A protein has these predicted regions:
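Core of compact, soluble alpha-helical bundle domains
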Residues: 26-189
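Short, conserved catalytic or interaction motifs in soluble domains
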Residues: 23
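Bacterial N-terminal signal peptides that target proteins for export
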Residues: 1-10
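C-terminal motif of bacterial Sec signal peptides marking the signal peptidase cleavage site
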Residues: 17-20
Length: 189
């Protein structure tokens, strides 16, 4: 009965139908204020979020391996064009994502898109050549922290969605991305 007592005045207040609900905004406000408030848990820290991702990826590893045994990620996402589309959108998002956009200053987005596409084509089972730097050398100067790593991963997720990738394929590449974290995160702040 207590939930109904709170819910009806709240719905009335939100919909602006106070007269139809038989009360005034003051009555609704006083009644809502008298109910105890539930304390929300604090948001997880970037370190906690990364630990959660690492645990999720470890748990998903058998399913990922089974999918890879059937067909490469490269083939399942539609090849180079699909990878390029996801990477181009990810790079575009990096340029406007507040926590990481400063890392993109002075970077040629077209060149970066081609380099990352070449890297991912090979990493996902496609054929080609990658002539870029290794992960450590490519990211050391950035002094990236976990919060920035998560921001970049969020952009990657959006890029894969933009390219039309399925949930399993997105999870697979994000888990590979999480596996590279020790090579790219070099700062704790």
């Amino acid at each position: 009965m207590k939930a109904t007592k709170i819910l009806i005045p709240t719905i009335c207040a939100l919909t602006g139908l106070l007269a139809a609900c038989g009360g005034t905004s003051d009555e609704v406000s006083q009644e809502a204020q008298s109910e105890p408030k539930v304390q929300e848990a604090p948001a997880p820290t970037p370190d906690q979020q990364v630990a959660g991702l690492e645990a999720m990826c470890a748990e998903a590893q058998p399913a990922i391996a089974a999918r890879q045994a059937e067909d490469s990620l490269f083939n399942r996402v539609g090849g180079r064009d699909s990878i390029h589309k996801a990477v181009a959108e990810t790079v575009r998002l990096h340029q406007i994502n507040e926590p990481i956009k400063h890392l993109m200053e002075g970077v040629d987005p077209a060149h970066l898109t081609e380099q990352v596409t070449d890297f991912l084509v090979l990493a996902t089972g496609g054929q080609g050549e990658y002539g870029g730097r290794n992960m450590v050398d490519a990211h050391a100067h950035m002094k990236m922290n976990n919060a920035q790593f998560l921001a970049a991963g969020g952009d990657l997720g959006k890029g894969m969605t933009f390219a039309g990738w399925g949930e399993n394929e997105k999870q697979e590449l994000l888990c590979a991305f999480v596996g590279l974290r020790p090579q790219v995160v070099t700062s704790e702040s």
